[in-house]
Regions:
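N-terminal targeting signals for Sec/Tat export/insertion, comprising classic cleavable signal peptides
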Residues: 29-58, 68
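Elongated, acidic membrane-bridging lipid-handling scaffolds
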Residues: 135-137
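C-terminal interaction modules
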Residues: 2-7, 19-25, 44-49, 63, ...
Length: 257
């Protein structure tokens, strides 16, 4: 009898273990919005507002505006005017987070309130460079010309580090890593990256990081639950659509017999 009880207890732990290993999608939400900011999902575009929740593969972009996005529990991404990003990955597995952002155009400021857990990775990629970190403050610029001049339109293509360390690679050769320390920069195009000391006019722009702060933990948990609820609803809708498609197929097969 004791052996039977032990078997039941052990087998009861198996589903829990699998549940812990199942990847979940991190929260990404708008902290502040000023002016024209939008997001695109499934081919549809809508204005971004404070507390707008974003999902993996969403494209977030600004025109004459700015937006601050919290990604996961400790990262804030500030998009300058005329900036476009894709949230390519927002995954958490076994308490390790994997965040990937694609900067299609414009300038993005990234700040971490604390280091990510060991084994985690935050990578932001422009058309020419990839910057990977676990906890720091830095700017990545695609260096493209903005539709209209603004306070950050003079930031050239490159990576500019305020605090911490950033590993930078050419987009076409991600195995070639150049490490940047605080106060350093890499500029140029893909095949001619130049490492140096950050220019004075760029150092002044680093003051923006003082304004970037994550939401309080209690608020984060509330919004995280809301995102999980929305994900569950989306899955139900998708499953319902699949069932309807299956019914239609079966109906056609039956009618053709």
């Amino acid at each position: 009898m004791p052996k039977i009880v032990l078997l039941v207890l052990v087998s009861g732990l198996i589903p829990l273990t699998y549940a812990q290993q199942k990847p979940k999608e991190l929260l990404a939400a708008a902290l502040s919005v000023s002016g024209e900011a939008f997001f695109e999902r499934d081919g549809k575009t809508a204005p971004a507002k404070i507390k707008t929740i974003f999902f993996k593969s969403d494209r977030v972009f600004t025109k004459k505006g700015k937006i601050d996005i919290q990604i996961g529990p400790s990262a804030v991404l500030h998009l300058a005017p005329y900036t476009s990003v894709k949230l390519a990955d927002l995954t958490e597995v076994d308490k390790k987070t994997h965040i990937a952002v694609e900067l299609d155009s414009g300038r993005g400021y990234t700040k971490f309130s604390k280091q990510m857990p060991a084994g985690s990775k935050y990578a932001i990629k422009s058309p020419t460079m990839v910057a990977a970190v676990r906890g720091t403050e830095f700017v990545l610029s695609a260096g493209d010309e903005s539709a209209e001049p603004h306070e950050d339109s003079d930031i050239p293509a490159g990576v500019f580090v305020n605090t911490g360390k950033v590993a930078v690679s050419p987009a076409s050769r991600e195995d070639e890593v150049i490490e940047l320390a605080p106060g350093e920069q890499i500029t140029g195009v893909d095949n001619t990256l130049v490492k140096g000391v950050m220019e004075d006019f760029l150092k002044k722009k680093m003051k923006l990081f003082k304004q970037l702060n994550c939401m309080k933990e209690a608020q984060y948990k509330i919004m995280e639950r809301e995102k999980n609820r929305q994900i569950e609803l989306l899955e139900k809708v998708r499953n319902s659509s699949k069932m309807e498609e299956l019914r239609e197929k079966n109906k056609k097969l039956f009618n053709n017999q």
